Amino acid sequence: MAVVYTKRGQFMDAYESLQEVVKRYPDYPKFNQIIGEEYNVASIIQGGATPYLWGWFPWFTNYSDAIKIYEGVVKNAPYSDYAPIALMNISLIAEDEDNPEVAFDALDRLINNYPKSMFAPDAYMQMAKVYKGMVEGPEYDHAPTRNAIIFYQDYLILFPK
């Protein structure tokens, strides 16, 4: 059913039908495939696809739906390969939507929970970039500047190559 909902542009309905499978059948043999489908639905929304209400009425793209679905992926399968990339995508969407708190949270979880992930170096750079975006000038609070410098230094120390 989720595939049909996705093709019709009913992305949240697709996610909810996939969530039903996850909740009712946690030992489902194709559990990773379900998580992959949830990830695909979120990435379609992140790509800017037009959602349709009731399958025929075009509506506005709501990127917070993508964040919600990515959070569901992390919650449902925290040890899967999808979790680190979902957290990175949450931070990218949050930064685009000018929501640095959500970006900080996602990047912090990525850095702390998945330090061996291939996305950990990018998470350090992204965290520094988000802090750098908060710098408003020399007359204002210097904490974002210091934090950006700290994350750039951490990146250089932890990932010298």
Regions found by a protein language model. Give the residues of each.
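Acidic, polar-rich low-complexity tracts and alpha-helical solenoid repeat scaffolds
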Residues: 1-161
